[in-house]
Amino acid sequence: MKNRNRMIVNGIVTSLICCSSLSALAASPPTEVKIVRDEYGMPHIYADDTYRLFYGYGYVVAQDRLFQMEMARRSTQGTVSEVLGKAFVSFDKDIRQNYWPDSIRAQIASLSAEDKSILQGYADGMNAWIDKVNASPDKLLPQQFSTFGFKPKHWEPFDVAMIFVGTMANRFSDSTSEIDNLALLTAVKDKYGNDEGMAVFNQLKWLVNPSAPTTIAARESSYPLKFDLQNTQTAALLVPRYDQPAPMLDRPAKGTDGALLAVTAIKNRETIAAQFANGANGLAGYPTTSNMWVIGKNKAQDAKAIMVNGPQFGWYAPAYTYGIGLHGAGYDVTGNTPFAYPGLVFGHNGTISWGSTAGFGDDVDIFAEKLSAEKPGYYQHNGEWVKMLSRKETIAVKDGQPETFTVWRTLDGNVIKTDTRTQTAYAKARAWAGKEVASLLAWTHQMKAKNWPEWTQQAAKQALTINWYYADVNGNIGYVHTGAYPDRQPGHDPRLPVPDGKWDWKGLLSFDLNPKVYNPQSGYIANWNNSPQKDYPASDLFAFLWGGADRVTEIDTILDKQPRFTADQAWDVIRQTSLRDLLRLFLPALKDATANLAENDPRRQLVDKLASWDGENLVNDDGKTYQQPGSAILNAWLTSMLKRTVVAAVPAPFGKWYSASGYETTQDGPTGSLNISVGAKILYEALQGDKSPIPQAVDLFGGKPEQEVILAALDDAWQTLSKRYGNDVTGWKTPAMALTFRANNFFGVPQAAAKEARHQAEYQNRGTENDMIVFSPTSGNRPVLAWDVVAPGQSGFIAPDGKADKHYDDQLKMYESFGRKSLWLTPQDVDEHKESQEVLQVQR
């Protein structure tokens, strides 16, 4: 039975009973767009030309996710206030200040006719359904529009592109904390002096750590460009000190439900600071993380290659990704993709498969531009005063007066911060600027690739810092750390802002330097947003460190344990890693510190309890508590340990950046991976002593023996936990971490009504979606088998009467139990599993 939002418009209704086989598609009229949905509501689009293929794509997206996409459009362009009111004015200003619309429009205008038809077809398809919705709102208007009091508007190619720019480029390739780092360095130098202060800064924010596990093994290759911290700080010494509140404190604060709080600037800073101290979501609130393992022909069993992807975007209702099959005009693909991009980020075409994780390469720099005191809007560049580019922006406000402001831009990029005390404007330079649309289309065009050379041609065009992964029907596997990266001047410390002029980039580094590997000796590729290659420099984010403590080791350890893996075993790695505590990192030090204590000493009891635990967090039958209190013990100990070490060494207020244990969250469930916190990584290096390659400029243990500090923190943990759970450690039942699929998108903007949030009792540290592609399986006669799980479900449609589409959350239980559903590719398979069918006649 068809859902009401899937009624046929502009075309022919073809019932399941009388429809013809999809194998007859070749004989269909050239104007025809055929839409077939499988048993989970996932659509497959069939058309003979690119425009109509993507017309069908946009059409089904509007059917399934119209309100989610509308709010994504407004979130990425800064027009939320127009429909939700003055609480979002500050948010809209921040968004508009961070992009340049004319650049995106110029990129679209320069596209070939074929590429333009991708974006135009998609927009026209959405508009076709929107017209029907507006004509019959009593039947087709998603209830969320009525709840929030506005109607959907037409889309254009710019809107389609901006969804990608705002949710991929600006979310995963635009993170920088160079100004925050400068604020930290200023405070550290004030406490320790210039030379020692810089050494302490290097201890807190190293650039390269030789002990960091890498996706490309050291025996395969290492990064050829070397960084010597002693010779890369010339420019940093020329930048004025920074005494204002760190910019990260001005990021919009969110409540427990992930919604923007819209509070005063002072209250916002207080809230953000408290959230950092208590466990900000992700790496200090930055998006994190994603994992991947690809098993090649020398390690796969009963198959030639196995790819398992787990991108961790956060958990949302409707789902963050959208499942789609595209067939025709040179495309024959199936998979899913964030925000229904017109290019699948996760999928396969029967011959190759692909997937992604965030790369966290450093593709953004901040330039400290000296402002003119006499000529407003002018800045100094190469000794001359240059007028900034500017544009006036007016924000329409529901039930309020419009607000107008100016966005400024230098030769380096948009001005994101101004320090009036030092007459300095901080401009953001992006290596991918001007390449946003080309990057989107690289994902689209890779869907046609049939081998490694063709696929890497598209990887070279993808300018964002994203890890790309490859497998093919012959069992070959590969990896590329894609992105465009600056060729910086000698003396440029990429962690800190640099002055203008002579510190301008020399250009972009050659793609030949991007880390990549094809058929590695290990037989597999694994990544959890760790370093791609030995000696590769990390992001400038103060909260992002590649070091000896890394979660990717959990994947590597499992894959190294046995010579070969079946598809089911590869899938089970999701379960094993998602429930695993990082006990292994600190247990040796804890055991050493308590070895000579009496067995009845509470501190010894805590460590003995940890030592008897395998590190896997399993939930009791009550669905609310863990079978073992291990994570609670480590959380309490690490929280105290960090306060006694890293936090104590860092001047206020910056100590709060390092106080979170990594176990807690400030929202009703995590927004990404509960990873090793930045403070824990710094502490881990200190506990390694001489084995750590990171110089310890300041003794984090304050001159005391480290075991004494460990025992004191254990005593704190005992005092905290025994008051809460009693004196019998064996009887402790600690609360399990829950998981929420939020009704607010990652910006904190509603993408659904609050009642649409879904909940899962047990948090699993795994992908927002998980997919697996298996090439040349020995069972059956198919050259490829594929599965995914996209929770809560394919649809986001809530009917005007409040009834949710049956595919809104029909993958929720599947996700919770580590299940998966098949992804169909061939016409025969799609035909056998179809639930509904539509045929449109599309004139152009």
Curated annotation (Swiss-Prot):
The active site is at residue 290. The gene is pac. The keyword Transit peptide does not apply. GO terms for biological process: antibiotic biosynthetic process; response to antibiotic. Its EC number is 3.5.1.11. Keywords: Antibiotic resistance, Calcium, Hydrolase, Metal-binding, Periplasm, Signal, Zymogen. It catalyses: a penicillin + H2O = 6-aminopenicillanate + a carboxylate. This is Penicillin G acylase. Residues 1-26 form the signal peptide. Residues 236-289 form a propeptide. One of its GO terms (molecular function) is metal ion binding. Its cofactor is Ca(2+).
